[in-house]
């Protein structure tokens, strides 16, 4: 995936695909987002429902402009081909690039909404 542009987005997406995140089991991806916020000196809050809010101060000179809010969900649809052994609770997604298309080997990719999270992390980086 190193050849895909913009690199920062695809690097974040790949990292997210390596974190098991079935519905109702988002703790690992939640921890990843929290660590990302800390690493980038951003305010990160998790509410009682498990939603993660990461805030970034305005760029200098834009403090009085309207706020922008980006949203994505953390879990993924967990489906696999009948001939594939994969545990969505523990196994990372096997990502492949095929003629410029990003795919998963025998499972769902988790692009809904992993790519949304990746784009937001790129904006926050």
Region spans (language model):
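N-terminal capping segment at the start of a domain
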Residues: 1-24
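Active-site metal-coordination/substrate-binding segment of hydrolases
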Residues: 62-125
């Amino acid at each position: 995936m190193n050849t895909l542009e913009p690199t920062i987005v695809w690097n974040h997406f790949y990292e997210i695909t390596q974190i098991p995140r079935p519905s109702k089991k988002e703790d690992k991806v939640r921890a990843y987002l929290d660590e990302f916020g800390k690493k980038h000196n951003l305010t990160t809050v998790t509410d009682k429902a498990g939603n993660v809010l990461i805030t970034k101060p305005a760029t200098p000179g834009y403090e009085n402009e309207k706020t922008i809010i980006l949203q994505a969900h953390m879990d993924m649809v967990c489906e696999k081909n009948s001939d594939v052994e994969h545990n969505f609770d523990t196994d990372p997604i096997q990502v492949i690039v095929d003629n410029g298309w990003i795919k998963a080997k025998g499972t769902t990719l988790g692009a809904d909404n992993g790519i949304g999270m990746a784009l937001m992390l790129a904006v926050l980086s």
